[in-house]
Amino acid sequence: EEQIRRNDVNDGGQRFPNGGNEPANIDIILTRGYKVGEILARHFGPDSIKPEYTYLKGDLTQAYTGKIKQFQRSFVFLNLDSKEHPAALIVFDRLTSSNQDFRKTWLLHSIEEPFIDGINITITRSRKDYNGKMINTTLFPASDNLLIKKIGGTGHEFDVMGTNHPAINLPDPATTSDESGSWRIELS
């Protein structure tokens, strides 16, 4: 049975090295379980100065507790050399949980409210003179087995399973980045 720790919030199995405390020095980083991943494969090319693609595959199993048997992520960044669509990023996760009944959920955080249209999620960044845009198209799971939820907005910035857990001592967004909280997509 799944056990919830850390203030009754489902951490998704994420492991917290050194008891969740920041490391004070390099010795702590090297000795207290901070290694959370390993590169399995990588490639880029064909031009080494301006590659058309970059491929990376990693094993991130060590970043999680016993809830996860295996987690590997592969991604390919494509330089499309286009002003309208400069790049594409393809991400493929292979995850095996220790309990097949655990619900697997992929999170995508955003500062501004995301928009959902079928299997497409659009996220923009227009405040503070930004003009970024990302369109996420979900290929797996198939649309007939896909659930996409949008969570966030006032009073739901840190909402987990229906309960908002507001952060304590957030920096003033007028003087710092406003990237904490806001919105996320849960895809399962």
Where are the predicted features?
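Catalytic and substrate-binding regions of extracellular carbohydrate-active enzymes
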Residues: 1-133, 142, 152-167, 175-188
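Active-site-adjacent helix/loop segment of glycosyltransferases
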Residues: 137
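PEST-like, low-complexity acidic/proline-rich intrinsically disordered segments
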Residues: 148, 168-170
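Intrinsically disordered, low-complexity regions enriched in Pro/Ser/Thr/Gly and acidic residues
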Residues: 140, 147-149
